[in-house]
């Protein structure tokens, strides 16, 4: 739970976000999740033609700028296509290797791993929870990053006119998120 301005919000859990299959080009389920989150919390948002999601929370004065957080909505694993079509969740298993804890996605039909850790569902998770935590913030969620940054290349530049800086939450290497749980 998160208390903001005397209101209590249920924070989005990482597990909720990781469970959503979102193969590149088939990201409707995660976009729908983000849109529903915005509606639930009364956040201003819009989608562009590519289905990038742009969110604004709060107001700024004329001489101020918004901070902005950014994440991408797609993953690279083809075995998720069937799960997306059937609107199935990815099973999340926690495994322990000595002192290390690792979250892995599992395909329920094949009982085999799917996904590469938190790329970039951790970014989506962080951005959504920051929208709850801060009074003034913009967030952009780009589609098809894993197949040539198609969403960000066609981003609405006007959304960023009043942005002072942006922070992107994406991992530099395979399984980077799993390594951060040590």
Q: Where do the PLM segments sit?
A:
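Generic, low-specificity signal for short hydrophobic/alpha-helical stretches with a mild N-terminal bias
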Residues: 16, 20, 108-109, 137
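Detector for Asparagine
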Residues: 5, 36, 52, 86, ...
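General beta-strand structural signal in soluble alpha/beta enzymes
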Residues: 46-49, 69-71, 104-105, 139-141, ...
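Residues forming anionic-ligand binding surfaces in small-molecule and nucleic-acid pockets
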Residues: 96-115
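Acidic/histidine-rich catalytic neighborhood of metal-dependent amide-processing enzymes
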Residues: 110-182
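Acidic/His- and Gly-rich active-site-bordering loop/insert found
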Residues: 6-102
């Amino acid at each position: 739970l998160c208390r903001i301005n005397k209101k209590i919000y249920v924070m989005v859990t990482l597990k909720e976000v990781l469970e959503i299959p979102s193969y590149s080009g088939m990201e409707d389920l995660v976009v729908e999740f983000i849109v529903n989150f915005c509606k639930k919390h009364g956040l201003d948002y819009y989608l562009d033609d590519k289905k990038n999601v742009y969110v604004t929370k709060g107001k700024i004065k004329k001489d101020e700028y918004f901070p902005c957080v950014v994440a991408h909505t797609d993953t690279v694993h083809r075995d998720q296509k069937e799960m997306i079509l059937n609107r199935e969740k990815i099973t999340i298993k926690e495994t322990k290797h000595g002192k290390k804890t690792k979250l892995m996605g599992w395909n329920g039909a094949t009982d085999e791993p799917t996904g590469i850790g938190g790329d970039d569902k951790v970014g989506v998770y962080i951005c959504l929870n920051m929208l709850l935590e801060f009074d003034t913030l913009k967030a952009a969620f780009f589609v098809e990053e894993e197949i040539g940054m198609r969403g960000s290349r066609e981003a609405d530049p006007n959304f960023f006119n009043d942005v002072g800086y942006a922070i992107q939450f994406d991992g530099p290497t395979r399984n980077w998120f799993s390594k951060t749980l040590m």
